[in-house]
């Protein structure tokens, strides 16, 4: 049983929790994290979701993602999801989420790191992850165009956001 903290519109804890799989009531918000892992060549690590995964089965997705569990910060959730899904330990203590997207059911924090990773060193969570690979910006766009990648509206900007230190060009 996965339990999430519920937040208000200001991202403050409400002292209420939610059980994954139950319907969120209007105004109940929770925290989700996505991690984008780039290698030194500037390629993005992506994962293919299992064909029986709830939500976007058999689609390619960002490096790792999931909901924050009760008591977790965004950073802790991001580190845990990478460990669970890819078997890789990362340390985000000296970084911040690159951006946060507010969606109907909560907040989605996006973490970006650059780390050279050997695919053969990863231990995939077989219940969730079917495959992994590194892709260029062009290959990512081809996967999105062919309907194989989850259609995040900001995919074209991911590679620019990776190195951005300001919101201006």
From Swiss-Prot:
The keyword Metal-binding applies. Gene3D superfamilies: Nucleoside Triphosphate Pyrophosphohydrolase (3.90.79.10). A motif (Nudix box) lies at residues 65-87. Mg(2+) binds at residues 81, 85. It comes from the Bacteria. Its cofactor is Mg(2+). Belongs to the Nudix hydrolase family. Residues 28-157 form the Nudix hydrolase domain. This is Uncharacterized Nudix hydrolase lin0387. GO terms for molecular function: hydrolase activity; metal ion binding. Keywords: Hydrolase, Magnesium, Metal-binding. It holds the Pfam family NUDIX. It comes from Listeria innocua serovar 6a (strain ATCC BAA-680 / CLIP 11262). InterPro entries: NUDIX_hydrolase-like_dom_sf, NUDIX_hydrolase_CS, NUDIX_hydrolase_dom.
């Amino acid at each position: 049983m996965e339990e999430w903290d519920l937040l208000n519109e200001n991202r403050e804890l409400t002292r209420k929790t939610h059980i994954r799989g139950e319907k969120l009531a209007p105004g109940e918000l929770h925290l989700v994290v996505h991690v984008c892992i780039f290698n030194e060549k500037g390629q993005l690590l992506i994962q293919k979701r299992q064909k029986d995964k709830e939500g976007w089965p058999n689609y390619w997705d960002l490096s790792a993602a999931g909901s924050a569990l009760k008591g977790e910060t965004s950073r802790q959730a991001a580190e845990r999801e990478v460990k669970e899904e890819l078997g890789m330990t990362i340390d985000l203590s000296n970084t911040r989420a690159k951006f946060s997207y507010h969606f109907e059911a909560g907040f989605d924090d996006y973490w970006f790191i650059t780390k050279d990773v050997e695919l053969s060193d990863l231990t995939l969570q077989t219940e969730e992850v079917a495959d992994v690979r590194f892709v260029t910006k062009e290959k990512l766009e081809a996967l999105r165009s062919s309907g194989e990648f989850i259609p995040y509206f900001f995919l074209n900007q991911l590679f620019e956001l990776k190195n951005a230190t300001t919101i201006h060009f």
